[in-house]
């Protein structure tokens, strides 16, 4: 085990290695062994304050030690809010599942460690390493995360940090939304807020400090899909340059925040481009107003090849059966009287037939 990996607050769970960092914390892979079988979880540890430097900085601004302690205690309550948010989603197949948590307060100093145990998943960044996602896979990702946002909306929760680093993949290939570290109930976030979140996927109204609603998560999801279908480049970044500079990123961000019309992502079909560009429209009123609406269009696109095949099979069936029906109609159509008489004569006794011919002569 890595010597820098801390000891778990759950004796039965051993922390093996650090696998990432999220909002205000580090994430570790943990293992529990029972009856010869190994089970795995992800444990996120949030330390408040994050460092001695942060503690000293706050101390210098506060009047006394009690005020300093209360300041950091409020941060602890904010982090516990993330835990309560995750509890709402227990059993949801498109949100990272919460399993348990513990809060430990230091005895000899101002500080807390918050441990959150969650299901162990593959990070989206690792999932994408060494391969390029097909449009079909990206559409599925869009569908899965749109379903996650539907549950957020039902609970009046805005995630505010939808980005590849907060997307995870289950062993069944389902995409999940995680890290609700800056999520807040919508009732408390409708007015101007701090610019928490990632600029690369941030909606313009947050960037400009304006009022916003849950459509900002739809915008961020749209930018995620855009990048995946645009050779892993954000809007307005050159597709020809191998090396993208900091200035390139700043210029691209400025153009996006100014409302310049985005070009279509180069690897997306026309139908998928329409969905993506609508999701990340500059004006909130021109976006999908609800994740349900975006999911509906994504599902139509996802099923389009299947529906087209079904329509082709139906048309072939109709053509085949139409031809067979026409043959049957010709075969069993009513006959002319003279045809019937002629067939009757042929079927008569030869002697009678001879007599009839002689009589006609």
Model-derived features: where do they sit?
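Short beta-strand micro-motifs within the conserved protein kinase catalytic domain, predominantly
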Residues: 97-112
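Catalytic-loop of the protein kinase fold
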Residues: 153-169
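Activation segment signature within eukaryotic-like protein kinase domains
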Residues: 141-142
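Conserved catalytic-loop aspartate of Hanks-type protein kinases
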Residues: 217
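Conserved short submotifs of the Hanks-type protein kinase catalytic core
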Residues: 109-124
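Regulatory extensions appended to serine/threonine kinase catalytic cores
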Residues: 306-361
């Amino acid at each position: 085990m890595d010597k820098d990996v801390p000891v778990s607050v759950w004796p039965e769970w051993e922390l093996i290695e650090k696998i990432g960092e999220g909002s205000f914390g580090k994430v570790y892979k943990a293992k529990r062994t029972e009856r010869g079988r190994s089970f795995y979880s992800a444990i996120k540890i949030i330390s408040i304050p994050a460092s001695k430097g942060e503690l000293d900085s706050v101390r210098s601004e506060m009047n006394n030690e009690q005020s300093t302690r209360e300041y950091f205690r409020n941060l602890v309550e904010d982090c516990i809010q993330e835990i309560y948010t995750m509890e709402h989603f227990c059993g949801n197949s498109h949100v990272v599942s919460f399993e348990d948590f513990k809060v430990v307060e230091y005895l000899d100093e101002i500080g807390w460690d918050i441990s959150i145990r969650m299901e162990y998943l593959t990070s989206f960044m690792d999932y994408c390493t060494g391969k390029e996602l097909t449009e079909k896979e990206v559409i599925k990702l869009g569908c899965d995360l749109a379903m996650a946002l539907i549950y957020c909306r039902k609970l009046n929760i805005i995630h505010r940090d939808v980005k590849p680093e907060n997307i995870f993949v289950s062993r069944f290939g389902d995409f999940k939304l995680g890290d609700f570290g800056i999520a807040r109930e919508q009732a408390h976030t409708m007015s101007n807020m701090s610019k928490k979140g990632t600029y690369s996927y941030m909606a313009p109204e947050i960037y400009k400090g304006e009022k916003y609603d849950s459509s900002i998560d739809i915008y961020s999801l749209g930018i995620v899909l855009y990048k995946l279908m645009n050779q892993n480049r954000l809007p307005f970044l050159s597709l020809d340059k191998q090396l993208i500079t900091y200035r390139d990123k700043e210029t691209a961000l400025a153009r996006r925040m100014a409302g310049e019309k985005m070009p279509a992502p180069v690897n997306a079909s026309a139908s998928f481009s329409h969905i993506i560009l609508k999701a990340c429209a500059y004006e909130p009123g021109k976006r999908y107003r609800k994740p349900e609406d975006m999911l509906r269009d994504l599902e139509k696109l996802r099923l389009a090849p299947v529906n087209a095949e079904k329509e082709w099979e139906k048309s072939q069936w109709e053509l085949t059966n139409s031809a067979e029906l026409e043959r049957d109609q010709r075969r069993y159509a009513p006959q002319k009287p003279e045809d019937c008489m002629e067939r009757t004569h042929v079927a008569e006794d030869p002697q009678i037939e001879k007599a009839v011919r002689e009589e006609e002569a």
